């Protein structure tokens, strides 16, 4: 990194499944110039419309473990009761920050805790639903998961909601425009 360019601001975004993280992130990607959005790696199957390398890097469990073993992951976790593994590749985040770009990392609760411990100057944002009932409605309305998967995601959501006080910022996603504006202000330090 050159001496006259500060590190880019690192913002960690977490929240329960179906809270609207993907919608908010899509808007931020188009609204924030020079934003580096960290693409997570996952062992889960793509949902309809998701693209490898844009939404996630989709890998097998074996490939994921090999990347961990080589030290190529900033953080990783087994999530939803062991249904899948997800994590953040380290090198692209480091490089974008050295270039002075704002960096947005979308992770689960465990990932947020791990990155915040490694990079304490990171800003942490918890994206919360307006209510538990709205979250349940959004999750079941997707129609992409079995009831067993929905139940596991709801169990995980209860744990995540209980931990929201650990985050520097809690933003309620009852209006996408308002949520995007609030996150944008944190990303840009305004």
UniProtKB/Swiss-Prot annotation:
Compartment(s) of residence: Cytoplasm
Protein name per UniProt: Guanylate kinase
Catalytic activity, as annotated: GMP + ATP = GDP + ADP
Pfam family, one: Guanylate_kin
UniProt-annotated binding residues for ATP: 15-22
InterPro entries for the chain: GK/Ca_channel_bsu, Guanylate_kin-like_dom, Guanylate_kinase, Guanylate_kinase_CS, P-loop_NTPase
Family statement: Belongs to the guanylate kinase family.
HAMAP family for the chain: Guanylate_kinase
PROSITE patterns the record matches: GUANYLATE_KINASE_1, GUANYLATE_KINASE_2
Its biological purpose: Essential for recycling GMP and indirectly, cGMP.
Recorded GO CC terms: cytosol
Domain Guanylate kinase-like intervals: 8-188
Keywords: ATP-binding, Cytoplasm, Kinase, Nucleotide-binding, Transferase
GO molecular function, one term: guanylate kinase activity
Claim: Kinase is one of the keywords in the record: yes
Enzyme Commission code: 2.7.4.8
């Amino acid at each position: 990194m050159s001496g006259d360019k500060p590190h880019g601001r690192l913002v960690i975004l977490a929240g329960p499944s179906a809270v609207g993280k993907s919608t908010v992130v899509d808007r931020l990607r188009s609204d924030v110039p020079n934003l580096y959005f960290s693409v997570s790696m996952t062992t889960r199957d793509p949902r309809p419309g998701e693209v490898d390398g844009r939404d996630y890097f989709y890998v097998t469990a074996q490939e994921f473990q090999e990347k961990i073993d080589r030290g190529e992951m900033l953080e990783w976790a087994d999530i939803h009761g062991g249904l899948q593994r997800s994590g953040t590749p380290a090198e692209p985040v480091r490089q974008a920050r050295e270039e002075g770009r704002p960096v947005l990392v979308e992770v689960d609760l465990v990932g947020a805790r791990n990155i915040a411990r490694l990079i304490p100057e990171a800003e942490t944002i918890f994206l919360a639903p307006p209510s538990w009932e709205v979250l349940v409605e959004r999750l079941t309305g997707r129609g992409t998961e079995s009831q067993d998967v929905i139940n596991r995601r709801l169990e995980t959501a209860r744990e995540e909601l209980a931990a929201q006080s650990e985050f520097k910022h809690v933003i309620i996603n009852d209006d996408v425009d308002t949520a995007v504006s609030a996150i944008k202000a944190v990303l840009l330090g305004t």
